[in-house]
């Protein structure tokens, strides 16, 4: 893990850490440093894997272009079928989003409750009981009536 660092150098770093941080904070510092090292290793491995995957994809594209340049008629039927499937998949990815034609009735939101209520059965403002204000007294102008 530590290329170029010998046992004596590690011992010296440990003693200096013990002197500077003390016995209480040294284990916490070592744990945090090892956590950072693990995170950096994970990040480096993920970048490495992504690059390898991209290189494989590029190699496959190069092989496909090479096969196309040689002529697709010389290929075996299995390879021809797989190339056709790849082309269909590429066309489906490259095609823009297409809206299917749906009749207008299917696009409407149906509300069965509003369809079952007829105009005769629906409550109107004229059939609702009305409450009339007290006639004779104006409560806005009479402060004694308000309080």
Curated annotation (Swiss-Prot):
- Subcellular location field: Cell inner membrane
- Asked whether the keyword Protein biosynthesis is assigned, the reply is no
List compositional bias (Low complexity) regions by residue number.
112-133
Q: Which GO terms describe its cellular component?
A: TAT protein transport complex
> In its keyword annotation, does this UniProt entry include Transmembrane?
yes
Q: Which InterPro entries match?
A: TatA/B/E, TatB
Compositional bias (Polar residues): 71-97
Question: Which residue ranges traverse the bilayer?
Answer: 2-22
| Gene Ontology annotations of biological process type | protein transport by the Tat complex
Pfam families attached here? TatA_B_E
User: Which keywords, in A-to-Z order, does the entry hold?
Assistant: Cell inner membrane, Cell membrane, Membrane, Protein transport, Translocation, Transmembrane, Transmembrane helix, Transport
Region (Disordered) residue spans: 68-147
Per its record, what are the GO molecular function terms? protein transmembrane transporter activity
Membrane topology (UniProt): Single-pass membrane protein
Q: Give the protein's function.
A: Part of the twin-arginine translocation (Tat) system that transports large folded proteins containing a characteristic twin-arginine motif in their signal peptide across membranes. Together with TatC, TatB is part of a receptor directly interacting with Tat signal peptides. TatB may form an oligomeric binding site that transiently accommodates folded Tat precursor proteins before their translocation.
Q: How does it assemble?
A: The Tat system comprises two distinct complexes: a TatABC complex, containing multiple copies of TatA, TatB and TatC subunits, and a separate TatA complex, containing only TatA subunits. Substrates initially bind to the TatABC complex, which probably triggers association of the separate TatA complex to form the active translocon.
In the record, the note on similarity to other proteins reads: Belongs to the TatB family.
Extract the HAMAP family matched here.
TatB
PANTHER family documented for this protein:
SEC-INDEPENDENT PROTEIN TRANSLOCASE PROTEIN TATA, CHLOROPLASTIC
Q: Which named protein is this?
A: Sec-independent protein translocase protein TatB
Q: Which organism is it from?
A: Shewanella sp. (strain MR-4)
């Amino acid at each position: 893990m530590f290329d170029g660092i010998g046992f004596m150098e590690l011992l010296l770093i440990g003693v200096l850490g013990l002197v500077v941080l003390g016995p209480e904070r040294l284990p916490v510092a070592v744990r945090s440093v090892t956590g950072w090292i693990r995170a950096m290793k994970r990040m480096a491995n993920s970048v490495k894997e992504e690059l390898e995957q991209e290189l494989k994809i590029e190699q496959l594209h190069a092989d496909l272009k090479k096969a196309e340049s040689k002529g697709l008629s010389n290929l075996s039927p299995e390879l021809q079928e797989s190339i056709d499937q790849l082309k269909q998949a590429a066309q489906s990815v490259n095609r823009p989003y297409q809206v299917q034609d749906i009749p207008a009735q299917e696009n409407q939101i149906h509300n069965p409750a509003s369809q079952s209520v007829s105009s005769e059965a629906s409550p109107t403002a004229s059939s609702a009981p009305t409450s009339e204000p007290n006639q004779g007294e104006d409560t806005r102008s009479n402060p004694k009536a308000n309080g």
